[in-house]
Amino acid sequence: MTSWRRAVPAVALSALAVATTAGCDNGWWTYHRDPVRSGVDSQLAVAGRVSAAWTTNLDGAVYAQPLVVGGTLVAATENDSLYGLDPGTGAVRWRTHVASPVSRSVLPCGNIDPLGITGTPAYDPTSKLVFAVAETQLGGKVTHLLAGVDPASGQQRILRPVDPPGSDPTASQQRGALTVTAGRVYVPYGGLAGDCGAYRGTVVASSTTGTGPLISYTVPTAREGGIWTPPGPVVDRSGNLLVQVGNSAATAGAWDGGDSVLKLSPDLRLLDSFAPASWAWDNAVDADLGSTAPSLTANGYLLAVGKSSTAYTLRAGHLGGIGGQVTSSQLCAAYGGTAVAGNTVYVPCTDGLRAVSVDSAGAPHVLWHANTAVTGSPVVGGGRVWSLNPSGALYGLDPRTGAVTQQLPMNQTSRFASPTLFSDSVLVPTLTGISAFRGA
């Protein structure tokens, strides 16, 4: 085990200069802004302190991170609605009710009631549609519908079922963010809270035209192995998809694909994988890697953190198979999405956000450890790191030190909520709608 070495905090500042925009102009088109899930907006214009600007109540809780496309803020609710808002004022421009959500009483377990659109939508600049998945019932059966909506008008242009094959749709939850790349929209699936029923972690892909057959990859386990974490699939420099997988059925014998990092081709063939040597034990005690997504650094490494408090550094070009990590070290238990600025990864640890720098040899260095109340999935912009506490607080942190520079009260959020950065504003999804905070 490699020890975590404390480095000079100024490294964090230099890392902030390397922001990944991935061609999404000055909007926010997907979870954490770009397909690599950097969570960095180098164009955010925040000077001085921020203050509450507006709050708009919607028809349900907002678990998904809001998007900003062409000057319209797009929010998705657990009432299966998509909204277009004015990001400057919060005024509602349009509302599209995709379907009727599923009552918790219909489901075998779970902790969202009702269950509608949970995963963060994604915008496709080619079709000019925002894609979202709505959970609903058709003919008395639970199903998942992929909707494609014009972000300017709210007009729905695509609607098709995208249930994971070989799994019970009633036990399958679409929590992870959608990913758009290579002319397809990718939809990850895990299970409901409680891991009940016959589900297996799956990624389903549809053409962005909404036509043609679906393709899919399913974790080769008897059950579980969820691909559930909010960031969804990450796209690497070669256009392949990276996912982290939760605990699966096997606790002895042959590895069955769980507790892992998987690399999938655009047509969803398995290309490469990593699993800790402790995968069987991790599966047995629910201490797997499925609670976050892969964090790609600028120098060619991948940092994978999960529930067990062990962080693994992998080579992005060769994941290493079972036990093939570059380093493994004790860091923290982490849930949600990281932010990545250059070679610095901001990790949403359950005992407080950490900034970790990965050097040219793959060795990790803890730069700072924030206040224990700062646990939300971070984003970076305007000279600050932004994070939420679900009890109702927005934090702005100094990226050099992790010190809290500002704490603002707000409505409660879901556990994995993450803010969106746009223009001079921080836009926050809450259990009642959207709240905006603006720089002075």
Model-identified regions with their sequence ranges:
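Aromatic-lined, polymer-binding surfaces characteristic
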Residues: 175
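Extracytoplasmic/lumenal domain signature
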Residues: 26, 30-33, 37-60, 68-73, ...
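Periplasmic/luminal catalytic loop of GT-C fold multi-pass membrane glycosyltransferases
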Residues: 118
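Secretory targeting and sorting signals
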Residues: 1-25
